[in-house]
Regions:
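Conserved metal-phosphate-binding beta-hairpin within the catalytic cores
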Residues: 173, 184, 238-270, 280
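Phosphate-binding site of ATP-dependent enzymes
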Residues: 149-232, 253-260
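ATP-binding N-terminal substructure of ATP-dependent carboxylate-amine bond-forming enzymes
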Residues: 1-89, 93-95, 99, 118-124, ...
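Active-site "cap" helix and flanking loop/linker of ATP-utilizing ligase/carboxylase catalytic domains
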Residues: 194-247, 278-302
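A glycine- and small-aliphatic-rich helix-loop capping segment at beta-alpha/alpha-beta transitions
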Residues: 74-83, 150-155, 282-285
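Glycine-rich phosphate/pyrophosphate-binding beta-alpha loops
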Residues: 142, 198, 265-279
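Active-site nucleotide/adenylate-binding loops and adjacent lid/helix of ATP-dependent enzymes
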Residues: 1-10, 38, 50, 93-178
Length: 302
């Protein structure tokens, strides 16, 4: 039986392009090690050039808009090309922080208090009286995220610029506590890792720079009961968004062991510094084995 021919989608047009290229390189090496024939393709918005390749499936190594928001998934579905990760609807919902929060609330999964900000005056609310976060509704990798001690410390010129750029922002209560991220693989939560950035915030640089000095604590330093509860909630989030394949959910765990979900990522990074491969490896699943599972899990109608 001949090995599958795989179309590896990487790069793309989003602000997370560099991360996607890094994920793509790691995935490419794993796929080649597994003996698959691999064609790398760097798509642009609306591009259907990949249809010229007669491949058995597409491995989606894209991050951010176009690759993570249901767009590329829709193109692949229309052409009946099997692909990895989540489907059209779940990708679109997970990428939209407002829609995913509403799903979490409906599923009784605790998430920080929030408000949609369309203009500066919308910030005159109860959340603004304490520490809060402003973030774009449809970006990943902490792109455009601002942490504010209170409303008076906010750079309103910067906020106006962001509103012009993104249209609207999500204002979210800042939860003090441990930063914990959990991975789900199919029908199983694999584990949870604690992140300790050298700075106050696990931003883009802390996630992807080798010089960031971010500490990874695996497994997360939590009481066993709380650790298991984080895993249970990560799996519930995966299910309530109808996700497929591998996901990573981000949490804050307070001193009182209250667990708040921040978001679920349907296209978690697979770079050398990424968390899902580290969690999987601790769980006994080497990177190559993880990639093989994702290939075997690929399908349409996701």
């Amino acid at each position: 039986m001949s090995k599958k021919k795989i179309l590896l989608l990487l790069g793309g047009p989003s602000k997370e392009r560099k991360v996607s290229l890094s994920t793509g390189r790691a995935v490419y090496l794993a796929l080649r090690k597994l003996g698959y024939e691999v064609i790398k393709f760097d798509p642009k918005i609306g591009s259907k050039f990949f249809l010229q390749y007669n491949c058995d499936l597409a491995f989606n190594a894209l991050h951010g808009q176009f690759g993570e928001d249901g767009t590329i998934q829709s193109l692949l579905e229309r052409q009946k090309i099997p692909y990895t990760h989540s489907g059209v609807k779940s990708s679109a919902i997970a990428m939209d922080k407002l829609k995913s929060k509403k799903k979490f609330i409906k599923a009784k999964i605790k998430t920080p208090e929030f408000k949609v900000i369309k203009k500066i005056s919308d910030l005159n609310n109860i959340i603004s009286k304490k520490k809060f976060v402003l973030k774009p509704i449809n970006e990943g990798s902490s792109v455009g995220v601002v942490i504010c001690k209170n409303l008076s410390s906010l750079n309103k010129v910067e906020v106006k610029m962001y509103l012009k750029k993104y249209g609207k922002l999500l204002q979210e209560e800042f939860i003090e506590g441990k930063e914990v991220q959990a991975a789900v693989m199919g029908s199983k939560a694999l584990g949870a890792i604690e992140i300790k950035p050298s700075r106050n915030f696990y931003d883009y640089n802390a996630k992807y720079s080798r010089n960031a000095k971010t500490k990874h604590i695996m497994p997360a330093n939590l009481e066993k009961k709380i650790y298991n509860k984080v895993l249970q909630i990560a799996f519930r989030a995966h299910k309530c968004l109808s996700c497929r394949g591998v996901t990573r959910s981000d949490f804050r765990v307070t001193r009182d062991n209250e667990i708040y979900i921040l978001e679920t990522n349907t296209q978690p990074g697979m770079t050398p510094l990424s968390l899902v491969p580290e969690i999987a490896d601790y769980s006994g699943i080497a990177f190559v084995k993880l990639i093989k599972w994702m290939v075997l899990d690929a399908s349409t109608n996701r």
